[in-house]
Amino acid sequence: MKTMINKFRLYYLAILGGLVLITSCNKDLEQLAPIPTPVYPTGNGVAATLAANANYSFYSALITRAGMTTTLNDLTKSFTLFATDNNGMRIFVSAASGGAIPPTGAPDATYLGFINTNLPAASAAGIVQYNTVGQKFPAASIGNSFPNYPITTQIILDPTQPFVRMNIFPVRGTFSYVNNVPLIGTDMAAANGIIHTGFSVAAPPSATLKTMLAGETSLSYFRAAVARADSGQVGLSRFDSLMNYGVTNMTILAPNDAAFQTLIFGMVYAQVLAATGNTTIATTQANAAVALGPSFFSTPAFYGTLPASSVRGIVAYHLLASLTTSTTSPYQPNIRVFSNNVPSAPTLVKTLVNGSIAAHPGVMAQATYTGPAVTSLKFSSYGSFPPGGAPFSYTANAVTTDKLAVNGVYHILDKVLLPQ
């Protein structure tokens, strides 16, 4: 009986406690200040602002073709748009038509006809979405540090994760750019945003680095070197997997086939000459190694000349990197360096080699400019070929620049850079 009484006592105490709470909750609710109704701007939105300017009639047509007019005129939202004027659109139409339409001189109706009819609506949408940012970025707010200031566009990379989006890369300086396109005008005001004007269209990429590199006929040795460097690696430790990972942000310096042929000939020649002292034998063997083509890297007889670890070091030296806060992988390939991001003065840039040797100075990069245009781009390596040269005396020229992929950019070089 005593036990039952104790149980009921606890039961009643619980009920009474609840009643106290209920009684307390019956007090008048605190009156909070009403949430103010947002005050939205009035006037022309981004699309309407361009439509009202005759010098942007072609880009206005592009917005219409893209089905983005309503979005860009929504005064409850804010935008930054990297657009281009009619001159820039003429350049774009000429390129998009494969040169069938000249960059100047054709009637306006010809350019508008291509935009309104020949350009796929999906392509137009991709261009406008890629150049649209969902907040205001006045020119003064765009970063000026190396290499650029990545900001999020309207292109969603993963439909299951709507916040994982493609970036675009403006930078502010003596000359300002979006990606590698010079900005010729900034801060055109619209009621709901800001419009910056590029020299032409900054086109969105559509393939990963792996896919684009696979299509380069002059990079067969580089692809073979990557395969050799990936021996024994798994996951994103494989360069091949990293180059196919859509949400990375990389810069690759890819030596062309002639560059690798020169390196292979020289290394085999030096090795055989040191062993035999016979220049004829050394030349014959070096020519035979070059004759193997890219399969040189998968031929066991030459594994001693270029072990997989050495090839991995060489490939890593051609991927630019920066220092992060990660304690496991402090140096990561997370910067997208366009040619116009490279200073005119020689500048050291870290690479993935720094992941193993933090004190390594990296590669030395230098660009030459005529106005906003990059007229030459070169990279010098710490090591030289033949060995024995002063650090950074061995220089490769970029023969192709600014090949833009979803997950990075690459430049094709005429020499293989050596980390030591």
Regions found by a protein language model. Give the residues of each.
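Mature, structured domains of secreted/extracytosolic soluble proteins
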Residues: 2-8, 25-420
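Sec-dependent signal peptide recognition
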Residues: 9-15
